[in-house]
Swiss-Prot record:
Protein's organism: Methanococcus aeolicus (strain ATCC BAA-1280 / DSM 17508 / OCM 812 / Nankai-3)
Cross-referenced NCBIfam families: aEF-1_beta, PRK00435.1
Protein name: Elongation factor 1-beta
Similarity comment: Belongs to the EF-1-beta/EF-1-delta family.
General function of this protein: Promotes the exchange of GDP for GTP in EF-1-alpha/GDP, thus allowing the regeneration of EF-1-alpha/GTP that could then be used to form the ternary complex EF-1-alpha/GTP/AAtRNA.
Pfam families the record matches: EF1_GNE
Keywords: Elongation factor, Protein biosynthesis
Coiled coil: none
Source domain of life: Archaea
HAMAP family xrefs: EF1_beta
One example GO MF annotation: translation elongation factor activity
Amino acid sequence: MGIVMVKLKVMPVSPEVNKDELSAKIKETVESMDIICRNIEVEPLAFGLYAVFPLIEMEEKEGGTEPVEEALANLDDVESVESVEVSLV
């Protein structure tokens, strides 16, 4: 098994959700799963809405990114989570 870099797209439930607090929750959740969070970018979309893009490094294993996606989707203030890029390192 190898190491993969995964870029996730995390959408908050509303524009009122604090970007910094959400980014901190994402990083804390990812790192509690023994996954490395390399970077977090916040990109504006429209009408005050934004998306958070954490870049994570994890071991390639059965189930892929599902466990981390589910953990992030269960956070308060998160509407949806999806993988937008996955590459083998």
